[in-house]
Amino acid sequence: HAGDLGNIVAGSDGV
């Protein structure tokens, strides 16, 4: 998810 938890697993950058 884009900006979900900032996890690499979630594929987001935490924004």
Curated annotation (Swiss-Prot):
> Which GO MF terms are attached to this record?
metal ion binding; superoxide dismutase activity
Q: Does the keyword Chloroplast apply?
A: yes
Complex formation: Homodimer.
Spell out the protein name for this chain. Answer: Probable superoxide dismutase [Cu-Zn], chloroplastic
Q: Name one GO cellular component term.
A: chloroplast
Q: How is the cofactor bound?
A: Binds 1 copper ion per subunit.
Which EC class is the enzyme in?
oxidoreductase
Induction per the UniProt record: By water stress.
Taxonomically, the superkingdom here is: Eukaryota
State where the protein is found.
Plastid, Chloroplast
Keyword Oxidoreductase in record: yes
Record's keyword terms, sorted: Antioxidant, Chloroplast, Copper, Metal-binding, Oxidoreductase, Plastid, Stress response, Zinc
| Annotated organism of origin | Pinus pinaster
